[in-house]
Regions:
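Short, contiguous strand/loop micro-motifs
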Residues: 57-59, 92-93
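Acidic, small/polar-enriched beta strand-loop surface segments
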Residues: 111, 119-177
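Short, histidine-centered active-site or binding-site loop motifs used for metal coordination
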Residues: 51, 86-89
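Amphipathic, non-transmembrane alpha-helical segments in extracytoplasmic/periplasmic proteins
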Residues: 1, 47, 59-83, 97-124, ...
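Surface-exposed aromatic
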Residues: 88-96
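Assembly/oligomerization scaffold segments
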Residues: 1-53, 57, 145-152
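Residue-level detector of flexible, active-site-proximal loop/helix-junction positions
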Residues: 37, 89, 137-139
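Generic beta-strand structural signal
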Residues: 43, 93-94, 128
Length: 177
């Protein structure tokens, strides 16, 4: 995201909304993580929605749960806003892990759900709400190909410098064993 320098000054952590005249049902809702500029006076922003926080590594335990349960636990633990969460009803294998990102666990649970009931699910942020959808419910009557209006693309690689995890200190209670 970029904009021409003017009286608007954005800082890291500022809320970024991309809407079409409707503050309740916009296109993007997130925060700025990086602000940069140069002599051209074009300000560049790196912005993320709340799924950026799903890269947080933590202790995750889930027994007899579903993909929906895992997403609910992540949202509760990371204080993320939940939206529509469709439940596949498939019990995923037990998770008992630490120092693995929430998003990695969810990706594995999506794979397990694809293998089990053979249904593909996706997790996405819909204007500030984490949603879990069965891909069948997201189909659109749209075809991208030779006869479409898609005429080009670009891509970039990054591992998002200066990203830090929280530090948890855990110790054994000597009196209770």
């Amino acid at each position: 995201l970029s904009y021409a320098k003017n009286d608007l000054t954005l800082q890291n952590g500022d809320v970024i909304r991309l809407t079409d005249n409707d503050q309740k049902d916009g296109i993007f809702f997130g925060s700025s993580f990086k602000v940069s500029g140069d002599k051209s006076e074009i300000i560049k922003l790196k912005v993320y929605d709340q799924l950026r926080y799903a890269k947080h590594k933590d202790i995750v335990v889930l027994e007899n749960g579903t993909l929906k349960t895992l997403v609910q636990n992540m949202c509760a633990h990371l204080s993320l806003t939940m939206g529509t969460l469709e439940d596949p009803g498939f019990i995923i294998p037990t998770i008992a892990d630490y120092e693995k990102a929430w998003l990695d666990h969810i990706t594995q649970a999506i794979s397990d759900t694809l293998i089990g009931p053979q249904e593909m699910y996706c997790i996405r942020d819909e204007y500030g709400a984490v949603c879990l959808w069965n891909m069948r419910n997201l189909q659109m009557p749209l075809v991208l190909g030779d006869e479409s209006l898609v005429t080009g693309y670009s891509w970039e690689k990054s591992i998002d410098e200066d990203f830090y995890n929280r530090v948890k200190v855990v110790w054994k209670n000597e009196s209770s064993g």
